[in-house]
């Protein structure tokens, strides 16, 4: 049975048992700051189990994408070296929200596993575990399922505390919890290992394939177990593990899905196919997690989820390097993955080009430092010793982009212990330096347990209200006096709180003659708005009746820019393609800043077309209508939604005629004509595959156009052109004249440099097989190249490394006499040198150039050239 068939069979079985098939949630959890990635099927139902969310169904079944890498659940170092560890896996699950409980959960699992109609697994190959005190589950297995007592194992508190057991699940120190019952499969006596609870339980013979969690209790802060009024069920079946069972293999990497990926890895790396090669398995696993993470909106970066993704990509690239592949290859595996899994997960097909682009960019970036970093690491490991020092690990991390776990992987392969504590000390020292160089704006969470705020701002700019709470220095107070900075909570507010990229409203709160200036509005809690600002006159007390008034001018500007953002979003998708997704936004009174997923720069022609479409919608002056409706009805309108975003049962749909339909809670103009004018003023990249566009509207756009007009007139006057059309010709003529002068100057400098270089060869360091010149001279990049070419032409065994500093920037040029290029390559030398001065470069074996930014490191770099050359010659 193929893995894809097994996935469908599971969902079909539970659908016949009255379960609703729910699509996998994103790998990026929403509204759950405790999770780095979705790592279990129940994650998307957490609020349902806690009673915070309700669904229109009480039974559900899913095939959930999961990632375990980074954070508490981190399988990274084991991946590729064991039969079942993965960074990405699929968890099949069935769930009951106060519907059925233990009896049905166990019977469902048993029927699916053993019925001839479904999987038909021999019953004598299965074993069940239960929590030691869970007699109910034990008796169901014994008396109803008919499992022999010797194959029902009671597992007690085996982790050092009451309820700390492999067979007792808990969400946290308090909250829902309960016993669980696991089903194990026997892979055969030829494989070492014992049953659960035995001294040999860590062996590979008995493998867990199913876990039924019975959410039966609510643990309070005193540790008391109180029965839940509506017990629930959360079960999980690892798809890859079960596929191994159904395909009669022991390792997950032997199943059909992985076999095809492993062959693709061998093809792209040029390595022979072998199930004994861990690097093939590492890469096959990692292409899954990396591709799915990028499809769900994660991009490589230096923090958070993006850094975990970067670590996984670089680990895969390093294993490719280990197999002998030094060119970018990882991104070429995406097509094979799409072939395997694109049917079940259409987002892979839809995002294939973006995934490939993001992976290729990251591969190329790491390739620039991988070889040099590996050389540094090899030199350090070659010195012997049982430990690799933390300072070396940190240098590899900080200078060459080697994540800690990548270096640790290599150390383990050599039986050398990485000094993690030393690395952490170096990291903390770097963090301390960063803290000293920055000042941070505190974002205090204000304590509040009163009534919610009712937002009136969609229809009102001025509201009569009452003060519910006041804050000063983050603490609740009873009054604010003149000059005090603080925050005000009122029961009815016209002030929009920052959300969805739109900044909070500003304005005033009046209590008679007393005035509080609102400079920002933020949500203290989900439905509690805090007005932050200064008491500019008199005093304000809790309980005061007040008038809250929004600043009309700023609100109107915010609305223009927010509505324009919606029109721009739609135009960008129409012009650039449906792959465009919002990655971030900031709407202020001055401008709108919009981040999108797009693999390359937006061209001037594309920007012009987006502007044309948006302004066309503005000129149409269509009505902007907002409606509250169910999510089901909203989906029927084809409203744009943020991929992976979590929405409530009811949503606000904003429609601008036939131009744009989008879910949004922000404030907007009444008609598109109110926007006035739209102009994009900048476009650029902020991360791999992410572009940032800034635009302005209304009078700001007019002001910008007038400034451009003045600038053109100033240029006409400065160039003494007759008309605007003559300006370009004047500028081109001036540039040509300047270029001719620069060439003349460069020629003179080159002659001087060559003359100075002749003496350098006389003073060359004689290393026997080669003569080394490593020096700094006065020259530009062109003169450096000419000097190096001249010197290598005058000697059969010269190795030349020359440096110069111009306007604070370092220029480097390396040359090697042709007779020596078999042993020493100029490209390798200049790359080695450039990385020490904050740069990069390369070239031919006999001549190569590079640049750098750190001129202070030049003496140290030039001095290191001799050691590098001696190593190459030895």
From Swiss-Prot:
Consists of three domains; the N-terminal catalytic domain, the editing domain and the C-terminal C-Ala domain. The editing domain removes incorrectly charged amino acids, while the C-Ala domain, along with tRNA(Ala), serves as a bridge to cooperatively bring together the editing and aminoacylation centers thus stimulating deacylation of misacylated tRNAs. This is Alanine--tRNA ligase. It is found in: Cytoplasm. Its EC number is 6.1.1.7. One of its GO terms (biological process) is alanyl-tRNA aminoacylation. CDD domains: AlaRS_core. Catalyzes the attachment of alanine to tRNA(Ala) in a two-step reaction: alanine is first activated by ATP to form Ala-AMP and then transferred to the acceptor end of tRNA(Ala). Also edits incorrectly charged Ser-tRNA(Ala) and Gly-tRNA(Ala) via its editing domain. Belongs to the class-II aminoacyl-tRNA synthetase family. GO terms for cellular component: cytosol. Zn(2+) binds at residues 562, 566, 664, 668. Its cofactor is Zn(2+). The lineage of its organism: Bacteria, Pseudomonadati, Pseudomonadota, Betaproteobacteria, Neisseriales. It is an enzyme of class 6 (ligase). Gene3D superfamilies: 2.40.30.130, 3.10.310.40, 3.30.54.20, Bira Bifunctional Protein, Domain 2, Threonyl-trna Synthetase, Chain A, domain 2. The keyword Cytoplasm applies. PANTHER family: ALANINE--TRNA LIGASE, CYTOPLASMIC, ALANYL-TRNA SYNTHETASE. It catalyses: tRNA(Ala) + L-alanine + ATP = L-alanyl-tRNA(Ala) + AMP + diphosphate.
């Amino acid at each position: 049975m193929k893995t894809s068939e097994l996935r469908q069979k599971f969902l079909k079985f539970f659908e016949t048992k009255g379960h609703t098939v729910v699509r996998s949630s994103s790998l990026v959890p929403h509204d759950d700051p405790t999770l780095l990635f979705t790592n279990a099927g129940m994650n998307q139902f957490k609020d349902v189990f806690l009673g915070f969310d309700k669904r229109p169904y009480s039974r559900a079944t899913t095939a959930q994408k999961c990632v375990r890498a980074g954070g508490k659940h981190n399988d990274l170092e084991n991946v590729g070296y064991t039969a079942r560890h993965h960074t990405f896996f699929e968890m099949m699950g069935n769930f009951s929200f106060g519907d059925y409980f233990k009896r049905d959960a166990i019977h469902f699992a048993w029927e699916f596993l053993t019925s001839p109609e479904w999987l038909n697994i021999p019953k004598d190959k299965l074993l069940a575990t239960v929590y030691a005190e869970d007699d109910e589950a034990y008796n169901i297995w014994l008396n109803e399922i008919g499992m022999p007592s010797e194959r029902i194992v009671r597992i007690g508190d085996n982790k050092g505390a009451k309820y700390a057991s492999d067979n007792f699940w808990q969400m946290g120190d308090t909250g829902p919890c309960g016993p669980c019952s696991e089903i194990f499969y026997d892979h055969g006596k030829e494989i070492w290992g014992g049953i659960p609870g035995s001294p040999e339980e860590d062996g590979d013979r008995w493998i867990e394939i199913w876990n039924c969690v019975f959410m039966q209790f609510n643990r309070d802060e005193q540790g008391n177990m109180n029965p839940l009024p509506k017990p629930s069920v959360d079960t999980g079946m690892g798809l890859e593990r079960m596929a191994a069972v159904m395909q009669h293999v022991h390792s997950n990497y032997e199943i059909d899905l992985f076999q095809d990926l492993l062959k693709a890895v061998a093809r792209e790396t040029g390595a022979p196919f072998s199930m004994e090669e861990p690097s093939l398995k590492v890469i096959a696993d990692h292409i899954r997690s990396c591709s799915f993470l990028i499809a769900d909106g994660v991009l490589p970066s230096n923090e958070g989820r993006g850094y975990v993704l970067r670590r996984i990509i670089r680990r895969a690239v390093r294993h490719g390097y280990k197999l002998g592949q030094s060119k970018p290859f990882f991104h070429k595996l995406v097509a094979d993955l799409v072939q395997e899994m694109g049917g079940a997960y259409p987002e892979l097909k839809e995002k294939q080009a973006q995934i490939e682009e993001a992976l290729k960019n990251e591969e190329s970036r790491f390739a620039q430092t991988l070889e040099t970093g590996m050389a540094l690491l090899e030199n350090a490991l070659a010195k012997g010793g049982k430990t690799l020092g933390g300072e070396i690990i940190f240098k590899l991390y900080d200078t060459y982009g080697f994540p800690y776990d990548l270096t640790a992987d290599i150390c383990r392969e050599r039986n050398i212990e990485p000094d993690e504590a030393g690395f952490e000390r170096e990291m903390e020292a770097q963090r301390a330096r960063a803290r000293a160089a920055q000042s941070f704006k505190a974002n205090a969470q204000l304590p509040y347990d009163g009534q919610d705020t009712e937002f009136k701002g969609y229809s009102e700019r001025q509201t009569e209200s009452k003060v519910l709470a006041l804050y000063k220095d983050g603490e609740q107070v009873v009054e604010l006096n003149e000059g005090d900075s603080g925050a005000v909570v009122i029961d009815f507010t016209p002030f929009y709180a920052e959300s969805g990229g739109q900044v909070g409203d500003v304005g005033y709160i009046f209590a008679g003659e007393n005035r509080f200036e609102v400079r920002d509005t933020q949500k203290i809690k989900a439905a509690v708005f805090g007005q932050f600002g200064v008491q500019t006159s008199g005093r304000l007390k809790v309980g005061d009746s007040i008038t809250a008034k929004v600043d009309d001018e700023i609100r109107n500007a915010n609305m223009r820019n927010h509505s324009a953002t919606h029109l721009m979003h739609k135009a960008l998708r129409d012009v650039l393609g449906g792959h465009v997704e919002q990655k971030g936004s900031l709407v202020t009174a001055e401008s709108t800043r919009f981040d999108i997923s797009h693999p390359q720069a937006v061209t001037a022609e594309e920007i012009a077309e987006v502007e044309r479409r948006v302004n066309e919608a503005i000129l149409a002056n269509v009505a902007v209508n907002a409606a509250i409706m169910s999510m089901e009805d909203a989906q029927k309108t084809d409203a744009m939604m943020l991929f992976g975003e979590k929405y409530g049962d009811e949503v606000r749909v904003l429609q601008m005629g036939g131009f744009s339909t989008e879910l949004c809670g922000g404030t907007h103009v009444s008609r598109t004509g109110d926007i006035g004018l739209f102009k994009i003023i900048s476009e650029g990249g902020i991360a791999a595959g992410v572009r940032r566009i800034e635009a302005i509207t209304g009078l700001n756009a007019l002001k910008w156009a007038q400034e451009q007009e003045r600038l053109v007139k100033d240029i006409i006057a400065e160039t003494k052109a007759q008309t605007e059309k003559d300006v370009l010709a004047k500028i081109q003529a001036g540039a040509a004249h300047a270029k001719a002068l620069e060439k003349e100057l460069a020629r003179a400098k080159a002659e001087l440099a060559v003359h100075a270089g002749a003496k350098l060869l006389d003073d060359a360091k004689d290393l026997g097989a080669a003569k080394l010149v490593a020096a700094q001279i006065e020259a530009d990049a062109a003169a450096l190249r000419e000097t190096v070419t001249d010197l290598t032409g005058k000697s059969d065994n010269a190795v030349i490394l020359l440096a110069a500093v111009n306007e604070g920037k370092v220029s480097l040029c390396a040359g090697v006499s042709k007779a020596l290029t078999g042993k020493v390559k100029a490209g390798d030398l200049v790359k080695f040198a450039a990385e020490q001065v904050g740069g990069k470069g390369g070239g031919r074996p006999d001549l190569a150039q590079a640049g750098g930014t750190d001129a202070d490191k030049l003496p140290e770099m030039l001095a290191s050239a001799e050691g590098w050359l001696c190593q190459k010659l030895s």
